[in-house]
Amino acid sequence: MINIGLSGSTGKMGKTITERIDKFKDCKISAKFNSTNNLDDLDNFCKNSDVIIDFSTPEILEKLINYALKHNTKLVIGITGLQPQHFKLLEKAAQTLPILYSANMSIGANLLSYLARKATKILDDYDIEILETHHRNKKDSPSGTAIMLAETIASEKGLNIAFNRGNRPRCEKEIGISSLRGGNVHGIHEISFLGDDEIITLKHEALNKNSFAIGAIKAAIWLQDKSPALYSMQDIYNYSLKKQL
């Protein structure tokens, strides 16, 4: 039985993971951490967990990593809004621990990333734009998923990523990200490939948070026998595909 520690347990993702964990017979939630806890509580939290799923806030990440290193506790990080210094912490810790980071844990969003990479190779002379839509209370903009998609596409074509063009026209070697906020939208991501004569759009819409929660739990299970490294959800799906072939 895999003991999963849940960080951010009182948030929307934490509650959804708690609801979905019973679908998995080989793991259980052994410890919880949320905003009512003291940061020093992370010591016992990590000690009582084989792996931690973290959907809290960037502010606790450094402390969480330090205690995870102390107790050799694996990490699944789903926090968005991370800054370059946070990724440096993850990369350094991943030399000692297996860590999986993803801005989006759902299979659909990661399939969208895969398809976008393939389409980018084929549609070489098309302009590419991303539109992401989320609920009115989402704090970060653009979304972590939109950035993930843009970075995937940009790496294929050597493009710059434009978050806010202001009053200037579109540059030739760039991919733009636009954001909408409103309502109770769980997440919509559209990638448009715009040619002179046609437009091709790839779209993923999350109807609820279940797919994110299930993906995070699967990531925690998958990570159990992995060597120290910084993994992504793409590693899980590539690994699963290879096992089937």
Curated annotation (Swiss-Prot):
CDD domains: DHDPR_N
Residue numbers annotated as active site: 134, 138
UniProt xrefs under InterPro entries: DapB_C, DapB_N, DapB_N_CS, DHDPR_bac, NAD(P)-bd_dom_sf
Residues reported in the UniProt entry to bind (S)-2,3,4,5-tetrahydrodipicolinate: 135, 144-145
Domain of life: Bacteria
PROSITE patterns named in the record: DAPB
Protein role: Catalyzes the conversion of 4-hydroxy-tetrahydrodipicolinate (HTPA) to tetrahydrodipicolinate.
Protein name: 4-hydroxy-tetrahydrodipicolinate reductase
